[in-house]
Amino acid sequence: MACLSRIFLILMITMSSSSPPFCSGGSRKELRDKEITSKSDDTQASYVLGSKFVDPTRVLQLSWLPRVFLYRGFLSEEECDHLISLRKETTEVYSVDADGKTQLDPVVAGIEEKVSAWTFLPGENGGSIKVRSYTSEKSGKKLDYFGEEPSSVLHESLLATVVLYLSNTTQGGELLFPNSEMKPKNSCLEGGNILRPVKGNAILFFTRLLNASLDGKSTHLRCPVVKGELLVATKLIYAKKQARIEESGECSDEDENCGRWAKLGECKKNPVYMIGSPDYYGTCRKSCNAC
């Protein structure tokens, strides 16, 4: 009887070892499928948002007075093309969701995170990314990246500027710092400017010294675009947090008297309080039609 029991036990062990491990195999297959799905999701996220990591080997310090830095290949080809597809002349690049609210485009959000990582400045201190196009300009003008003529008013809280090149140009469009220590490229007539527009490159320059005082050497100008088209995105970074109500789609007044004040002309008489400034979020933006 003991012999039969021993034989039965041997048969059971043999059958167990020869049977295909359905559960084990299924688990491995399920795990493998999860890994493939995870990799696919990571690839998709990487394509949508782009790389948020900063590669210090691509960064060159071009000047200390003022502080000017060049990042080669800051944006990918896809990111440049995406910004171009979203652009509206002199306006922020946003998208609108199903509810009609204005939201920051995911690719733009990724770019802004990378800008913050590169500059070591909080993202909340930055203004919206703006995209502009320049073609066939008069060579006698001194231009900048914030309009047709160089701005004569410097925001008191402006700390730094990031210029993102979205295209190459056949001729022109270089960025110059006439008062900087960079030599000798101080003229649009000189060739070989390292700050010439190259698609994907980014330039960071500070308008303040390390002690927070204004850097007079940060005065800059842009060479006119003689041939081709220049597409460029700019982002201003301030010393203080910037209110960007557009992200939530809200537009409201903070005082019940705003409507009456607006009718009395206070929007023009007292624009800082009513509409706002880089340092102050306006109290009556809705009544002043500022949003």
UniProtKB/Swiss-Prot annotation:
GO molecular function: iron ion binding; L-ascorbic acid binding; procollagen-proline 4-dioxygenase activity
Manganese among keywords: no
Cofactor: record remark: Binds 1 Fe(2+) ion per subunit.
Keyword set, alphabetical order: Dioxygenase, Disulfide bond, Endoplasmic reticulum, Glycoprotein, Iron, Membrane, Metal-binding, Oxidoreductase, Signal-anchor, Transmembrane, Transmembrane helix
Subcellular localization, as worded in the UniProt entry: Endoplasmic reticulum membrane
Signal peptide (residue range): none
The protein's required cofactors: Fe(2+); L-ascorbate
Chain ranges of the Fe2OG dioxygenase domain: 125-239
GO cellular component: endoplasmic reticulum membrane
Disulfide pairings: C251-C291, C258-C284, C267-C288
Binding site for Fe cation: K142, D144, H220
Enzyme category, top tier: oxidoreductase
RNA-binding found in the keyword field: no
Matches recorded under InterPro entries: P4HA-like, Pro_4_hyd_alph, ShKT_dom
Sites where a glycan is attached: N211
Catalytic activity: L-prolyl-[collagen] + 2-oxoglutarate + O2 = trans-4-hydroxy-L-prolyl-[collagen] + succinate + CO2
Membrane topology: Single-pass type II membrane protein
Cytoplasmic membrane side: 1-156
Positions in the Lumenal compartment: 174-291
Listed transmembrane segments: 157-173
Role, per record: Catalyzes the post-translational formation of 4-hydroxyproline in -Xaa-Pro-Gly- sequences in proline-rich peptide sequences of plant glycoproteins and other proteins. Hydroxyprolines are important constituent of many plant cell wall glycoproteins such as extensins, hydroxyproline-rich glycoproteins, lectins and arabinogalactan proteins.
Family: Belongs to the P4HA family.
Protein name: Probable prolyl 4-hydroxylase 12
Naturally occurring in which organism (per UniProt): Arabidopsis thaliana (Mouse-ear cress)
